[in-house]
Amino acid sequence: MGRGRVQLKRIENKINRQVTFSKRRSGLLKKAHEISVLCDAEVGLIVFSTKGKLFEYANDSCMERILERYERYSFAEKQLVPTDHTSPVSWTLEHRKLKARLEVLQRNQKHYVGEDLESLSMKELQNLEHQLDSALKHIRSRKNQLMHESISVLQKKDRALQEQNNQLSKKVKEREKSAQQISGINSSSLFAHTDFYLGTYQSTNVIDNGKWKEVVLHSSKVQLIIL
């Protein structure tokens, strides 16, 4: 005789119901993983327990991407079949979908900061770890890029300041050189022009600061006469 079909009905005993849920849930997640690997299918599985605890599986570790794809597909199907989008039923379904998606996003956000990890299996924890490692690599890459850009800007500013400093030093040296030349001209402007003798007197014409002057020598005494 063939094996009789077991009638499916709700398990009344809470303990047995919880044990059965845990076993069937593990088997369901395993089957979802198997079909995704064997058939190269994109699988997303969402299960809520009677207490409202969420269990999920996504073969590509991104449930959001699967949900977005499902929404795009559902939207395309709705475009082919005319429906009354203004009906209360349509708005209720849309609200439920958005609420479910919001819950998924909030839960994933908690997972990313290390909260509410008790509900995750080993595989889910490994997937989460992989996501965080990938995110950290992108963060470090962006941080290093910004650091290199900041260093490049500082180096350009440093070169500009050095160039300004060199120009200022050059101008100072040119001014010092000009001042020395002017000082040398002034010191050499006092020179003898003619010498002549008048009896016991000796006179000499000189130029001092652009003015002609006559120096008269009498014995050992020198008299300066300004013309």
UniProtKB/Swiss-Prot annotation:
Xref: InterPro entries: MADS-box/MEF2_TF, MEF2-like_N, TF_Kbox, TF_MADSbox, TF_MADSbox_sf
Lineage of source species: Eukaryota, Viridiplantae, Streptophyta, Embryophyta, Tracheophyta
Keyword field contains Amino-acid biosynthesis: no
Domain (MADS-box) ranges: 3-57
Tissue: Flower specific.
The name this protein goes by in its record: Agamous-like MADS-box protein AGL8 homolog
Localisation: Nucleus
Its job: Probable transcription factor.
Keyword Transcription regulation included in the entry's annotation: yes
Transmembrane segments: none
Native species: Solanum lycopersicum (Tomato)
Single biological process term from Gene Ontology: regulation of transcription by RNA polymerase II
PROSITE patterns, alphabetized: K_BOX, MADS_BOX_1, MADS_BOX_2
One Gene Ontology term, aspect cellular component: nucleus
Keywords from the named record: DNA-binding, Nucleus, Transcription, Transcription regulation
Any one Gene Ontology molecular-function term assigned to this protein's record: RNA polymerase II cis-regulatory region sequence-specific DNA binding
